[in-house]
């Protein structure tokens, strides 16, 4: 929105040329989203407390979690609001990739909101029925996948980029739709599984978003894309503003979500943020790098799959409890230790993911 205003006023006031620079808008994006989150946080928490919208805690979970019962949840609303407002302010709204991320963010946020609402307001512990949750997740992902394929099929935008191999970039064809679907839905649910401790999900999300901001900038710059042997996709440069908005909103939320948490993001936040990271990975053609940078999310998801599979096949559990962060809690690790160590792992994996751009 502001970039349109700048283009209108630039002939009369040269100062407005500043608003057209991507670097300036990226910095403005992170600061705007951060300030919005910090401003909305206390007001939202107070409102959630008044409405008695508190966290539901499993009776079979770690005993340390019983004290979290009643802590305000659905705080993801402020994350999404901060991101959407910031993107509408600072991004180029003529860019279709920006709208692709916003559609997934808002759509998955709506699914998560209904799920949270049924759990904490209607007191239905099951929330949104699983098949309906996956139906709407799938529907949104497929709509976006088909739209993106129609927009960029048989171009660099539908190639598969394989880390460490600069000459391996096969054209996916219709498999692009399948890959896009699984990346968006899979990442959404992976972040949702990770969101079990104070600040555990939001900080890796911030780190991965920061990593994708760098990748989006390189992918959208013809010189750097050529130098790094990655596809040049012009529209991706504007995703830098989207990624920095996620970083700013996430850091603002962490101010209130850090241990001991004053608010939880709920499914409205985790499903939406995961879906957004998934579609960004697709747009910058780095789905495989997402597996590396989002290694904490992958680890949490695999722990659940292995736990369920082992119990059904052998009648035995591999972990004391899944997702794996609960396993370490039950081993006696204090919650802050689990959280910070997972943050460290995430930071290292994001750096490794960024290194794959050069190591080819």
UniProtKB/Swiss-Prot annotation:
GO terms for biological process: cell division; cell wall organization; peptidoglycan biosynthetic process; regulation of cell shape. The keyword Magnesium applies. GO terms for molecular function: metal ion binding; phospho-N-acetylmuramoyl-pentapeptide-transferase activity; UDP-N-acetylmuramoyl-L-alanyl-D-glutamyl-meso-2,6-diaminopimelyl-D-alanyl-D-alanine:undecaprenyl-phosphate transferase activity. Pfam families: Glycos_transf_4, MraY_sig1. It is found in: Cell inner membrane. It is an enzyme of class 2 (transferase). Its cofactor is Mg(2+). Pathway: Cell wall biogenesis; peptidoglycan biosynthesis. It catalyses: UDP-N-acetyl-alpha-D-muramoyl-L-alanyl-gamma-D-glutamyl-meso-2,6-diaminopimeloyl-D-alanyl-D-alanine + di-trans,octa-cis-undecaprenyl phosphate = di-trans,octa-cis-undecaprenyl diphospho-N-acetyl-alpha-D-muramoyl-L-alanyl-D-glutamyl-meso-2,6-diaminopimeloyl-D-alanyl-D-alanine + UMP. This is Phospho-N-acetylmuramoyl-pentapeptide-transferase. It comes from Vibrio atlanticus (strain LGP32) (Vibrio splendidus (strain Mel32)). The lineage of its organism: Bacteria, Pseudomonadati, Pseudomonadota, Gammaproteobacteria, Vibrionales. The gene is mraY.
């Amino acid at each position: 929105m502001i970039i349109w205003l700048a283009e209108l006023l630039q002939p009369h006031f040269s100062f407005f040329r500043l608003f057209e620079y991507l670097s300036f808008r990226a910095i403005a994006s992170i600061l705007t989203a951060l300030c919005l989150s910090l401003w909305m946080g206390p007001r939202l928490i107070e409102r959630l407390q008044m409405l008695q919208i508190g966290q539901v805690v499993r009776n079979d979970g770690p005993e340390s979690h019983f004290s979290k019962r009643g802590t305000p949840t659905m705080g993801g609303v402020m994350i999404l609001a901060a991101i959407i407002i910031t993107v509408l302010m600072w991004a180029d709204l003529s860019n279709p990739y920006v709208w692709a991320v916003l559609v997934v963010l808002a759509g998955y946020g709506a699914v998560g909101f209904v799920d949270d609402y049924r759990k904490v307001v209607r007191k239905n512990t099951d929330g949104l029925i699983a098949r309906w949750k996956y139906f709407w997740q799938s529907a949104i992902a497929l709509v976006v996948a088909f739209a993106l394929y129609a927009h960029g099929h048989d171009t660099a935008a539908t190639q598969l980029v394989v880390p460490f191999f600069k000459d391996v970039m096969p054209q996916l064809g219709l498999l692009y739709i399948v890959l896009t679907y699984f990346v968006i839905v899979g990442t959404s649910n992976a972040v949702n599984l990770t969101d079990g401790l104070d600040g555990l999900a939001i900080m890796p999300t911030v780190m991965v978003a920061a990593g994708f901001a760098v990748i989006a900038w390189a992918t959208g710059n013809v010189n750097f894309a050529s130098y790094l042997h990655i596809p040049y996709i012009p529209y991706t440069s504007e995703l830098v503003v989207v990624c920095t908005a996620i970083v700013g909103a996430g850091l603002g939320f962490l101010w209130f979500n850090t241990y001991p948490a004053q608010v939880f993001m709920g499914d409205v936040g985790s499903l939406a943020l995961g879906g957004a990271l998934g579609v960004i990975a697709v747009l910058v053609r780095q789905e495989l790098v997402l597996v590396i940078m989002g290694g904490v999310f992958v680890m949490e998801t695999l722990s659940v799959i292995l736990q369920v599979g082992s119990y059904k096949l052998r009648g035995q559990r591999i972990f004391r409890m899944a997702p794996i962060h609960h396993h370490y809690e039950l081993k006696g690790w204090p919650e802050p230790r689990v959280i910070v160590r997972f943050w460290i792992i995430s930071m290292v994996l994001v750096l490794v993911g960024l290194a794959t751009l050069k190591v080819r």
